[in-house]
Regions:
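Membrane-interface interhelical linkers
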Residues: 1-12, 45-72, 90, 118-126, ...
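Specific transmembrane alpha-helical segments of multi-pass solute transporters/efflux pumps
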Residues: 16, 20, 49-101, 107, ...
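Hydrophobic/aromatic residues within transmembrane alpha-helices
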Residues: 27, 36, 40, 88, ...
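Transmembrane alpha-helices of multi-pass small-molecule transport proteins
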Residues: 30-80, 105-107, 111, 162-166, ...
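Structural signature of hydrophobic alpha-helical transmembrane segments
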Residues: 31-46, 87-106, 149-163, 212-227, ...
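Helix-helix packing/entry segments at the starts of transmembrane helices
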Residues: 39, 97-103, 168-192, 223-263
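C-terminal transmembrane-helix exit sites in multi-pass transporters
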Residues: 105-130, 255-274
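Hydrophobic transmembrane alpha-helices of multi-pass small-molecule transport proteins
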Residues: 121-142, 260, 272-291
Length: 346
């Protein structure tokens, strides 16, 4: 990620998803959490359906794989994930919610190991999982930034788990629908599920609610900027720089959320919050140590070297390099590289 356009796109995405947590915090002052999440995806679904129509994309599911993808994305990635996320954030600060959801790339490898037959987990990833979970413990213990609000952390962890399971299951589907069409379906199905869950919960009744202007602005901002704009920026970034570099946005988002929560909402950032986040970042680095080293190493003069091939090498000051179409051999991560670690959550 060296071009100015890629960096600006990365920053725009981090800001869109990072500020989402503050917008959720504002909206929760006037709206019950599950209803708020449902309304957010009402707005986003309308925008995505309009995009499908405007672009003339195929929207009708053609195969069983399409229907499976719609069900997985709608039920897990949108419905269950955001229900748990919004309920969890009603107990904790926006910064803590953002930090807990940054566990998604760390929890993906062990879940993928159970579901994807060719997926392999190496020892550093196991250590990374333990370190990342230790970060959650640091944040959640009484006397930390949550003041013992373990219920909120529990809901947030549930949101992370259903998102990871949904992402891995989606990886297994063979689908023909364009990504924008799939997103439109997922948001519409997810919104319907959220409305259903809200209707079944007595505390979620919208009868007699007074929607403050700030909550209305937060709702529109979440639907338009954070969801529609965020997904657009994410998939553009994914196409330009790949899944590994795009997934780093998960660790810029909590920084944005913490700064905005402190500046706009007066939230406190404690040493426990900072320490827990540092452990989660360290856990991510261990989970992705091969891929990160492959990309960062050459920039500092170290890192993996590609194996020489007879007749196709070039010697520069004693170092032999291969043609650009050669692979990294043992450093190729194979199946794991195709799993997208973007949360889209925020």
């Amino acid at each position: 990620m060296t071009s100015k356009r890629d960096i600006l796109l990365f920053l725009a995405l981090a800001i869109a998803w990072g500020t989402a947590f503050s917008a959720i915090e504002i909206g929760l002052e006037s709206l019950p959490p599950i209803l708020f999440a449902a309304l957010r995806f009402d707005v986003a679904a309308v925008l995505f359906v309009a995009a499908v129509v405007a672009l003339g994309l195929e929207w009708r599911p053609q195969t069983s794989g399409d229907w499976t993808a719609i069900a997985v994305a709608g039920v897990l990635l949108v419905g269950a994930h955001f229900a748990f996320l919004f309920v969890g954030q009603s107990y904790v600060s926006s910064a803590v919610a953002a930090i807990v959801t940054s566990l998604i790339p760390i929890l993906t490898p062990p879940i993928a190991l159970l579901v994807l037959p060719r997926y392999r987990v190496r020892a550093p990833a196991v250590v990374g999982l333990a370190v990342g979970l230790a970060g959650i413990v640091v944040i959640a213990v009484p006397g930390g930034s949550l003041d013992g609000h373990l219920v909120g952390v529990g809901f947030l962890l549930a949101s992370v788990l259903v998102f990871v399971v949904g992402s891995v299951l989606l990886e297994r589907t063979v689908r023909t629908l364009p990504m924008v069409s799939l997103q439109a379906w997922a948001m519409a199905v997810g919104a319907a599920i959220l409305h259903g869950a809200s209707a079944l919960h007595p505390a979620e009744s919208g009868v007699g609610l007074t929607l403050a202007p700030s909550a209305l602005v937060a709702l529109v901002y979440l639907g338009v900027v954070c969801t529609a704009g965020g997904f657009l920026a994410y998939f553009l970034l994914l196409e330009r720089v790949g899944a590994t570099e795009a997934s780093l946005v998960n660790y810029a988002v909590p920084v944005v959320a913490a700064v905005v929560g402190w500046a706009a909402l007066g939230e406190t950032i404690t040493l426990a919050t900072i320490g827990g986040f540092a452990l989660i970042v360290a856990g991510f680095a261990l989970c992705k140590i091969d891929v990160l080293w492959r990309q960062v190493g050459p920039l500092v003069g170290y890192g993996p070297r590609r194996r020489p091939a007879a007749g196709r090498g070039v010697v520069v000051d004693g170092n032999q390099y291969l043609a650009d179409d050669d692979t990294y051999g043992e450093y190729d991560t194979g199946e794991s590289e195709r799993i997208t670690h973007g949360t889209g959550a925020d």
